[in-house]
């Protein structure tokens, strides 16, 4: 399961969603100020500075570039 924590008007959030949809990955998209607050984000992703923040199988992996690298290693 992939969890994407994003925000509106975020090209890399959109790219992460598109990659997951295209490849048929099981994923959930959570949006800032709808599904979580900044404070909750920082609790779950200490040191987070950019969007999206992504978790794969319960492990924080980083942003879109890290998701793309994970995808290419499969």
Predicted region positions:
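Alpha-helical elements of the RecA-like P-loop NTPase motor core of helicases
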Residues: 14, 39, 69
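Conserved beta-strand scaffold positions in the cores of enzyme catalytic domains, especially
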Residues: 27-29, 60
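Non-catalytic, surface beta->alpha helical segment in thiol-disulfide oxidoreductase systems
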Residues: 56-74
């Amino acid at each position: 399961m992939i969890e994407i924590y994003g925000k509106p008007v975020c090209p890399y959030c959109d790219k992460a969603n598109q990659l997951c949809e295209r490849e048929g990955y099981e994923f959930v998209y959570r949006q800032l100020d709808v599904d979580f607050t900044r404070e909750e984000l920082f609790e779950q992703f200490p040191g987070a500075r950019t969007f999206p923040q992504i978790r794969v199988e319960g492990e924080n992996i980083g942003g879109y570039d890290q998701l793309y690298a994970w995808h290419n290693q499969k």
